[in-house]
Amino acid sequence: MVTVDEIRQAQKAEGPATVLAIGTATPPNCVDQSTYPDYYFRITNSEHKTELKEKFQRMCDKSMIKKRYMHLTEEILKENPSVCEYMAPSLDARQDMVVVEVPKLGKEAATKAIKEWGQPKSKITHLIFCTTSGVDMPGADYQLTKLLGLRPHVKRYMMYQQGCFAGGTVLRLAKDLAENNKGARVLVVCSEITAVTFRGPSDTHLDSLVGQALFGDGAAAVIVGSDPLPQVEKPLFELVWTAQTILPDSEGAIDGHLREVGLTFHLLKDVPGLISKNIEKALVEAFQPLGISDYNSLFWIAHPGGPAILDQVEAKLSLKQRKMQATRHVLSEYGNMSSACVLFILDEMRRKSKEEQLGTTGEGLEWGVLFGFGPGLTVETVVLHSVAT
């Protein structure tokens, strides 16, 4: 007779969870940040709000974003005028878009990740799907399973309405699944489309305007598994340690509410200040056991909620400017894509590291950190170990 303990031991993987492939996708419609204020105020019939437009122009100029990708084209917005108004009932119109487009964009990213992984999709044992864009039953996880033709008994996890920290959450969950289920291969997909948050400008809700200046659409997928098959699977990053915490005195700092008018977005406190004030504590908890106290010796992946967060974290920790290079590049080229951002940054980092022959997937360094920041204020921390290139 086999004991429960023996069964448990047999279920566990030998080594740490490892990122084995990454894929990303965006809608084809690309918007230029420098001309976006003109377009945004025209399409929302708000050109008479000249002072507000000047404010928005300044927000866009300071955003450090060059371009973003959006499912919402001028044509779609003209067909759905309620989406362009500031607070018009429009949830049905928004939902009709995102329940189709979120899994579709997710499929595009997942297909690229599976291709890079090089294994048959029948070997995917678990699926984690994450989006803050719309809610449906059965969920986007089910739709993606159908779109990709995954096995019907793939084990699915659907994460709705998590917000910008969730790129860290999905890696934490994938790590636990991979390490506790021998042979598991976890497909992780974050797909975000701003059709739920887009709306016209208002003098009384400037935090909504901040969102209009920052948010973009994108999907990212990773394959995670332990004990990579030699000569078959190519490890990129090892997921060594994870944590999640709610920052003190931060309640209501970032809120989102799903209403008849879509998803409303609220910034109620000094978010960059709260994050920078608490970042060192998170780093000490993560890296003290490894004997690391020089945070410039790490490679950095931080959710680019906005340039002020990155600036204040850099200043607080005396980070060298190049530390946030990959993070700032993704912000500049795509905007804030909520949960998908940190996975885009992982992709950018491994590509750049290979191109520049830096020796490891983490800019030539051995250890790194990935941070997700979002509603709560919630902070996700992931300790990464790079792989030799």
Swiss-Prot record:
Keywords: Acyltransferase, Flavonoid biosynthesis, Transferase
EC number: 2.3.1.74
Reactions the enzyme catalyzes: (E)-4-coumaroyl-CoA + 3 malonyl-CoA + 3 H(+) = 2',4,4',6'-tetrahydroxychalcone + 3 CO2 + 4 CoA
A GO biological process held by the record: flavonoid biosynthetic process
Active site, UniProt feature: 164
Domain of life: Eukaryota
One protein family per Pfam: Chal_sti_synt_C
Keyword Transcription belongs to the record: no
Cross-referenced SUPFAM superfamilies: Thiolase-like (SSF53901)
GO molecular function terms noted in the UniProt entry: naringenin-chalcone synthase activity
Function recorded in the entry: The primary product of this enzyme is 4,2',4',6'-tetrahydroxychalcone (also termed naringenin-chalcone or chalcone) which can under specific conditions spontaneously isomerize into naringenin.
Protein's name in the database: Chalcone synthase 1B
